[in-house]
Amino acid sequence: LAGRTAVLKLLPFSHYEMEKGEILPSSVNEEVFKGAYPRIYDKAINPNDYYPFYIQTYVERDVRLLRNIGDLSKFIKYLKLCAGRIGQLLNLSSLANECGISVTAATNWLSILEASYICYLLKPDYNNYAKRLVKTPKLYFYDTGLACSLLDIQNAEQITTHFLRG
Protein backbone atom coordinates (compact mmCIF):
# COMPACT_ATOMS: atom_id res chain seq x y z
CA LEU A 1 0.00 0.00 0.00
CA ALA A 2 2.94 2.31 0.48
CA GLY A 3 3.67 4.53 -2.48
CA ARG A 4 0.13 4.81 -3.74
CA THR A 5 -0.43 7.95 -5.69
CA ALA A 6 -3.14 9.70 -7.60
CA VAL A 7 -2.70 10.48 -11.26
CA LEU A 8 -4.33 13.66 -12.49
CA LYS A 9 -5.03 14.26 -16.14
CA LEU A 10 -4.98 18.02 -16.66
CA LEU A 11 -6.29 19.00 -20.06
CA PRO A 12 -6.68 22.48 -21.55
CA PHE A 13 -9.57 24.55 -20.23
CA SER A 14 -13.04 23.64 -21.42
CA HIS A 15 -15.37 26.28 -22.83
CA TYR A 16 -17.36 26.06 -19.60
CA GLU A 17 -14.27 26.63 -17.44
CA MET A 18 -13.25 29.68 -19.47
CA GLU A 19 -16.77 31.06 -19.24
CA LYS A 20 -16.96 30.54 -15.46
CA GLY A 21 -13.46 31.96 -15.01
CA GLU A 22 -14.44 35.00 -17.08
CA ILE A 23 -11.55 34.51 -19.50
CA LEU A 24 -13.62 33.47 -22.51
CA PRO A 25 -12.41 35.23 -25.67
CA SER A 26 -14.82 37.62 -27.37
CA SER A 27 -15.51 35.42 -30.40
CA VAL A 28 -15.50 31.76 -31.37
CA ASN A 29 -12.69 32.39 -33.86
CA GLU A 30 -10.61 34.03 -31.12
CA GLU A 31 -11.28 31.08 -28.82
CA VAL A 32 -10.21 28.61 -31.51
CA PHE A 33 -7.10 30.66 -32.34
CA LYS A 34 -5.96 31.16 -28.75
CA GLY A 35 -6.72 27.61 -27.70
CA ALA A 36 -7.22 26.73 -24.07
CA TYR A 37 -3.85 26.20 -22.44
CA PRO A 38 -4.01 27.94 -19.06
CA ARG A 39 -0.61 29.64 -19.48
CA ILE A 40 -1.92 31.79 -22.33
CA TYR A 41 -4.66 33.20 -20.13
CA ASP A 42 -2.71 33.28 -16.88
CA LYS A 43 0.15 35.35 -18.32
CA ALA A 44 -1.77 37.02 -21.19
CA ILE A 45 0.67 35.56 -23.72
CA ASN A 46 0.18 36.03 -27.46
CA PRO A 47 -0.48 32.60 -29.03
CA ASN A 48 1.97 33.45 -31.84
CA ASP A 49 4.69 33.77 -29.20
CA TYR A 50 3.65 30.79 -27.07
CA TYR A 51 2.87 27.89 -29.39
CA PRO A 52 6.03 27.83 -31.56
CA PHE A 53 8.16 27.55 -28.41
CA TYR A 54 5.75 25.00 -26.95
CA ILE A 55 6.10 22.87 -30.08
CA GLN A 56 9.89 23.21 -30.07
CA THR A 57 10.14 22.28 -26.39
CA TYR A 58 7.66 19.42 -26.80
CA VAL A 59 9.52 17.92 -29.74
CA GLU A 60 13.04 18.47 -28.40
CA ARG A 61 12.39 17.26 -24.85
CA ASP A 62 9.16 15.34 -24.34
CA VAL A 63 9.15 13.35 -27.57
CA ARG A 64 12.76 12.27 -27.09
CA LEU A 65 11.92 11.04 -23.59
CA LEU A 66 8.99 8.97 -24.84
CA ARG A 67 10.69 7.45 -27.88
CA ASN A 68 13.92 7.76 -29.77
CA ILE A 69 12.97 9.46 -33.02
CA GLY A 70 15.85 9.78 -35.44
CA ASP A 71 14.53 12.48 -37.76
CA LEU A 72 12.75 15.16 -35.73
CA SER A 73 11.96 17.19 -38.87
CA LYS A 74 9.85 14.27 -40.14
CA PHE A 75 8.09 14.12 -36.78
CA ILE A 76 7.26 17.84 -36.98
CA LYS A 77 5.96 17.33 -40.52
CA TYR A 78 3.85 14.43 -39.21
CA LEU A 79 2.51 16.65 -36.42
CA LYS A 80 1.57 19.37 -38.93
CA LEU A 81 -0.11 16.85 -41.22
CA CYS A 82 -2.12 15.57 -38.25
CA ALA A 83 -3.23 19.15 -37.54
CA GLY A 84 -4.43 19.38 -41.14
CA ARG A 85 -6.56 16.28 -40.65
CA ILE A 86 -8.53 17.30 -37.57
CA GLY A 87 -12.03 15.86 -37.67
CA GLN A 88 -11.20 13.49 -40.51
CA LEU A 89 -11.10 9.72 -40.53
CA LEU A 90 -7.67 8.53 -39.49
CA ASN A 91 -5.67 7.19 -42.43
CA LEU A 92 -2.24 6.15 -41.17
CA SER A 93 -1.15 4.88 -44.60
CA SER A 94 -1.71 8.31 -46.12
CA LEU A 95 0.05 10.08 -43.24
CA ALA A 96 3.01 7.70 -43.47
CA ASN A 97 3.23 8.09 -47.24
CA GLU A 98 3.20 11.90 -47.09
CA CYS A 99 5.89 11.93 -44.38
CA GLY A 100 8.09 9.33 -46.01
CA ILE A 101 7.89 6.98 -43.03
CA SER A 102 6.55 3.48 -42.50
CA VAL A 103 3.01 2.81 -41.32
CA THR A 104 4.55 1.29 -38.19
CA ALA A 105 6.38 4.56 -37.48
CA ALA A 106 3.18 6.55 -38.11
CA THR A 107 1.34 4.30 -35.65
CA ASN A 108 4.10 4.67 -33.06
CA TRP A 109 4.19 8.44 -33.49
CA LEU A 110 0.43 8.65 -33.06
CA SER A 111 0.77 6.76 -29.79
CA ILE A 112 3.30 9.41 -28.67
CA LEU A 113 0.83 12.18 -29.52
CA GLU A 114 -1.91 10.36 -27.62
CA ALA A 115 0.29 9.60 -24.60
CA SER A 116 1.33 13.25 -24.36
CA TYR A 117 -2.25 14.53 -24.73
CA ILE A 118 -1.68 16.33 -28.01
CA CYS A 119 -4.16 14.24 -30.04
CA TYR A 120 -6.96 11.83 -29.36
CA LEU A 121 -9.00 9.47 -31.47
CA LEU A 122 -12.77 9.75 -31.42
CA LYS A 123 -14.17 6.29 -31.87
CA PRO A 124 -17.36 5.89 -33.90
CA ASP A 125 -20.62 5.38 -32.04
CA TYR A 126 -22.57 2.33 -33.14
CA ASN A 127 -25.10 0.22 -31.27
CA ASN A 128 -23.23 -2.83 -32.52
CA TYR A 129 -20.16 -3.24 -30.28
CA ALA A 130 -18.15 -5.06 -32.97
CA LYS A 131 -18.66 -2.17 -35.39
CA ARG A 132 -17.36 0.28 -32.79
CA LEU A 133 -14.16 -1.71 -32.60
CA VAL A 134 -13.48 -2.07 -36.32
CA LYS A 135 -14.68 1.22 -37.80
CA THR A 136 -12.16 4.02 -38.37
CA PRO A 137 -11.85 6.70 -35.67
CA LYS A 138 -11.47 10.43 -36.32
CA LEU A 139 -8.41 12.42 -35.31
CA TYR A 140 -8.69 15.46 -33.02
CA PHE A 141 -6.34 17.74 -31.09
CA TYR A 142 -6.95 18.55 -27.44
CA ASP A 143 -6.04 22.20 -28.06
CA THR A 144 -7.21 24.17 -31.08
CA GLY A 145 -4.62 26.92 -30.55
CA LEU A 146 -1.83 24.39 -30.96
CA ALA A 147 -3.45 23.11 -34.15
CA CYS A 148 -3.77 26.68 -35.47
CA SER A 149 -0.09 27.28 -34.83
CA LEU A 150 0.87 24.06 -36.62
CA LEU A 151 -1.29 25.18 -39.57
CA ASP A 152 0.45 28.60 -39.63
CA ILE A 153 -2.74 30.48 -38.80
CA GLN A 154 -1.54 33.89 -37.62
CA ASN A 155 -4.75 35.47 -36.30
CA ALA A 156 -8.39 34.77 -35.51
CA GLU A 157 -9.60 36.48 -38.69
CA GLN A 158 -7.82 33.89 -40.86
CA ILE A 159 -10.02 31.19 -39.38
CA THR A 160 -13.11 32.69 -41.02
CA THR A 161 -11.83 31.85 -44.50
CA HIS A 162 -9.49 28.95 -43.75
CA PHE A 163 -10.04 25.91 -45.95
CA LEU A 164 -10.14 23.59 -42.91
CA ARG A 165 -12.86 25.54 -41.09
CA GLY A 166 -15.86 23.49 -40.23
Report the location of each language-model feature.
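Conserved small helical "lid"/interfacial subdomain of P-loop NTPases
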Residues: 12-27
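Short secondary-structure boundary/capping segments
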Residues: 7, 21, 29-30, 130-131, ...
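A short helix-turn-beta junction within AAA+ P-loop NTPase domains corresponding to the substrate/partner-engaging
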Residues: 1-16
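Gly/Ser/Thr-rich beta-alpha loop segments that engage phosphate groups in nucleotides
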Residues: 5, 37, 89
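Short, hinge-like loop/turn segments at secondary-structure boundaries
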Residues: 1-4, 25-26, 139
